[in-house]
């Protein structure tokens, strides 16, 4: 029988052939993006590939992941739902408001969302939080992976409107989407500074680590609102 | 203060207490449509940190949290589906056709080469390539079937090619038929792109030609994005690799991307191509903006560009001296 | 000493002087055929350094050097053409079909993906892919044409896909037709390879199956070359990259190349696959040799291999313990 | 008017935009493999790409090229005729016996041979010179580019049968076709030794140079028979 270790609420490490990250499948029997299903004593786990998920990589890079089974989450940059599906597994009794701007990705994401009651798909520009203010409630976590040059500003605007006082921001910064020419290190320094100071409300950075070897030139950031 | 939510309009006091409300009917589709109509309203937004679900409970819109989430799930899903169904705009249809054409071109070339190589074992002297070869094979199969009144009769009769067995002949004819099918697909796609471009972007089509214009839209992603690009970007669209190299390693800035295929550039002597590309890109940018914002045809654009190119050429009759 | 030349047989003395000669008629084709027949003769070769053209002049076969060269040019050209026309042997025809099939598979996949992506904007819920999707589009075009008795009727009616305009429908139907044409081409090529393999290499076909057998011949270049390979080579045919790495950088030797697709290997547990591959390669090598040298079907081959594989599996019921 | 320099009999360097190797076209107006035609005062030159021809590279690597207009040449490994066409230009009044084993290449080569009277195509294995002994006269030069592991032996056998006492051998050795694993330097040393000693008749090496930058891991060798 595979060896199972709890890494964080709802997030497991399963030892079967090799170490694998996994969540408990909220939609038993169904696979979302080609991942493996592993059944152990009646529970079904879905493996989670950190190379295909920034959040998965953050888990393995030992970030504190502020997610529990009744978390309310605003997920910016849902894409076709690879990572959202795991967030939905973890926040099984919570709510995952999932914003995605590309209608092509939303087409695929809808298939996932229609099978999971805790996902609320929103086709909108994450840079314009007003456009979904009539839908989204205050949340405990904003996860953001939008690959936009103004991502610090986007995070601040959404946090101002939706983030609870004690809530967290988890952010993935892709150096290339800020500036294709400058060095990733410089970019990261600059972006962290922007998060701290450039916009209202400012953030307090709790953790900032690159996501190597799972993602090249990506910085993961955990932050909360400045008091 | 009045605020709009997905389930109704509320009148809220300064402490956040609900003074009055006007709830929407609970139909999924209707709620979805209302939700979509609220997207662009700049007024009556809920205040920061406003708890929508508590308000919905308080107004009696739903009886429980689980009803709230269940309804919101259906409504957001329906709204997203409605948005997706409207996402395919006329310029996106052109983009799809351009992408399909690229695939067709690539596969047609690869299968044509295979046919040439394969049939070459049986009639290497035919001198035919591409669609002409495919049509020839569909018509005759083995070179033994070429009749005396065909211009290739003598070459077929005296060919050093091997004898084509019946089973292989059927195979080659079938393969050639598929190749012909791809060639007619190419023509159909080109005709579609030409007529769609004329309707969607008449000015861009005049300046760039329908195929180049469509390719520019396709690489930009949409006519809107193309219209928003500065002309210096349009000049190098499609030269991504060279541009990236330029930004990273201070290599020389590329002079032109896909617009290189424009006759004004490739018929110009090499030493004025950069200048012509700059003039062309500026006019393309203008044309795309007119097309996106007004969609009326400006008949003077082409004449202005021709005049500009004429002047550039006249001012630079000779190549620069090497130093 | 008698010697053979392309223009006749000569009787030459010990000093190289011509004692007698028997010249061939001067017809180009006849001379070419005679020249070809002399290729494999091991006897009556001209001595090293023998001057053929001087002899041809001396015997009066030609009146001048320019006549000699002109005639030889025509004769060698004709001989080469005759050889080329006979170069397409039955195994070469199979190789051509395998190469054509590879091209067809690649292009079919790429166009199928494009069709899936493109039509997905209009009916993303269809759940159809590949040929089934292409056939569906050829049949109905827009999802609005799906009749109530079709199993996809409800999904089509409630789809979030965009409305498909007439012009785009014609485009998509045409594209789907081309894709269908490629799928039927695939089937035709596979059927050809199966029947040709059964005729050319019945033993190889029994052991490896027609498609894998054909692929092995194709990569080896011919049945003759495949029959000449040691079984250790057959085991890794198609694993060129891994093999090269092994030779260059002392990476582990690859365990199997294209024979990996054989059911005996891919249904075996991973820890016996290397052993099974070795047994299979040995039997394939034997089969190819029987096919090349005698072409009679050996009915015991398959039973022997099955027995061998059974034994390997029985002897290794469990994975090796990790150290 | 382009500047023309004679490098060796029948071999020119033309300065037009850049330095280009060229031969006088024996088949005016016709192009063989996509090369350029340059007309100067009624004479038509064909440019010769050293990256597509070992012999062309040897010219630029300053090998003595023992070819003149009435040379008799045995060319082993004619392929589809790129280089043979230039040899045919140079030995315009001579004879180029051209051996090629692959019938697929011969199919293309025949098109070239049929337009040039001094080319004699032979579809045969260069390792079996007996099979064309009834056709080939004694020659002044053997050029060999066969990419076979036993190329030294092939050269010796053909030289024994066909090479004049004062004739030359020009050889291109591709390291990869001898051994894919060993270092090119080792291979070249070994092959040169074989040419000198391993087979009858032995060769005397006159020149041996790699063909960089035109061809990687290739050695060019000029040799004559040992006295």
From Swiss-Prot, chains A, D:
A GO term, aspect molecular function: rRNA methyltransferase activity
Residues bound to S-adenosyl-L-methionine: 82-83, 100-101, 125-126, 145-148
Key word Plastid present: no
Coiled coil spans: none
Keyword Nucleotide-binding in annotation: no
GO terms (BP aspect): box C/D sno(s)RNA 3'-end processing; rRNA methylation; tRNA processing
InterPro entries: Fibrillarin, Fibrillarin_CS, SAM-dependent_MTases_sf
EC number, as in UniProt: 2.1.1.-
Keywords: Methyltransferase, RNA-binding, rRNA processing, Transferase, tRNA processing
Highest taxon listed in the record's lineage: Archaea
Matches recorded under Pfam families: Fibrillarin
Principal EC category: transferase
Gene3D superfamilies named among the record's database cross-references: Phosphorylase Kinase, domain 1 (3.30.200.20), Vaccinia Virus protein VP39 (3.40.50.150)
Family, similarity comment: Belongs to the methyltransferase superfamily. Fibrillarin family.
Role, per record: Involved in pre-rRNA and tRNA processing. Utilizes the methyl donor S-adenosyl-L-methionine to catalyze the site-specific 2'-hydroxyl methylation of ribose moieties in rRNA and tRNA. Site specificity is provided by a guide RNA that base pairs with the substrate. Methylation occurs at a characteristic distance from the sequence involved in base pairing with the guide RNA.
Subunit structure: Interacts with nop5. Component of box C/D small ribonucleoprotein (sRNP) particles that contain rpl7ae, FlpA and nop5, plus a guide RNA.
PANTHER family reported in the protein's UniProt record: FIBRILLARIN, RRNA 2-O-METHYLTRANSFERASE FIBRILLARIN
Protein name: Fibrillarin-like rRNA/tRNA 2'-O-methyltransferase
């Amino acid at each position: 029988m595979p060896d199972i270790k709890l890494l964080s609420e709802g997030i497991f490490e399963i030892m079967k052939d090799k170490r694998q990250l996994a969540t408990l499948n909220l939609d038993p029997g169904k696979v979302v993006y080609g991942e493996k299903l592993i059944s152990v004593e009646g529970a079904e786990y879905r493996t989670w590939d950190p190379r295909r998920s920034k959040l998965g990589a953050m888990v393995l890079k030992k970030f504190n992941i502020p997610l529990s089974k009744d978390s309310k989450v605003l997920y910016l940059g849902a894409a076709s739902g690879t990572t959202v599906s795991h967030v939905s597994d973890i926040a099984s009794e919570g709510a995952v408001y999932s914003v995605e701007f590309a209608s092509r990705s939303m087409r695929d994401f809808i298939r996932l969302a229609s099978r999971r009651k805790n996902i609320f798909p929103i086709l909108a520009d994450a840079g314009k939080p007003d456009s979904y203010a009539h839908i989204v409630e205050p949340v405990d976590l904003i996860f953001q992976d939008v690959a936009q040059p103004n991502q610090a500003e986007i995070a601040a605007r959404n946090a101002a409107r939706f983030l609870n006082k004690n809530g967290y921001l988890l952010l993935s910064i892709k150096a290339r989407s800020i500036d294709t020419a400058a060095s990733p290190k410089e970019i990261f320094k600059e972006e962290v500074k922007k998060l701290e100071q450039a916009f209202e409300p400012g953030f307090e950075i709790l953790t900032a680590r690159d996501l190597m070897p799972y993602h090249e030139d990506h910085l993961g950031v955990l932050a909360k609102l400045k008091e | 203060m009045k605020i709009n939510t997905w389930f109704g309009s509320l009148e809220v006091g300064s402490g956040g207490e609900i003074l009055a409300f006007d709830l929407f009917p609970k139909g999924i589709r209707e709620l979805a449509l209302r939700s979509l109509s609220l997207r662009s309203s700049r007024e009556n937004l809920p205040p920061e940190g406003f708890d929508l679900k508590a308000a919905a409970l308080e107004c009696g819109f739903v009886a429980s949290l689980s009803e709230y989430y269940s309804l919101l799930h259906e409504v957001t899903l329906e709204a997203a589906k409605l948005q997706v169904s409207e996402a395919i705009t006329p310029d996106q249809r052109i983009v799809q056709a351009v992408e399909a054409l690229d695939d067709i071109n690539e596969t047609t070339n690869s299968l044509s080469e295979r046919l040439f190589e394969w049939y070459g074992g049986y009639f290497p002297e035919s001198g035919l390539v591409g669609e002409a070869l495919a049509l020839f094979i569909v018509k005759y199969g083995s070179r033994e079937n070429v009749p005396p009144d065909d211009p290739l009769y003598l070459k077929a009769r005296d060919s050093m090619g091997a004898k084509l067995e019946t089973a292989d002949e059927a195979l080659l004819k079938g393969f050639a038929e598929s190749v012909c099918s791809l060639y007619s697909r190419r023509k159909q796609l080109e005709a579609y792109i030409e007529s769609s471009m004329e309707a969607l972007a008449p000015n861009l089509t005049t300046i760039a030609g329908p195929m180049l214009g469509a390719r520019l839209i396709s690489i930009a992603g949409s006519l809107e994005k193309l219209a928003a690009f500065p002309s210096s970007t349009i000049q190098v669209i499609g030269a991504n690799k060279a541009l990236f190299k330029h930004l990273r390693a201070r290599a020389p800035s590329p002079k032109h991307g896909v617009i290189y295929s424009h006759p004004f550039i490739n018929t110009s002597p090499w030493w004025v191509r950069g200048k012509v590309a700059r003039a062309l890109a500026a006019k393309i940018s203008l044309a795309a903006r007119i097309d996106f914002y007004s969609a009326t045809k400006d008949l003077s654009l082409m004449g202005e560009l021709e005049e500009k190119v004429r002047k550039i050429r006249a001012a630079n009759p000779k190549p620069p001296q090497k130093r």
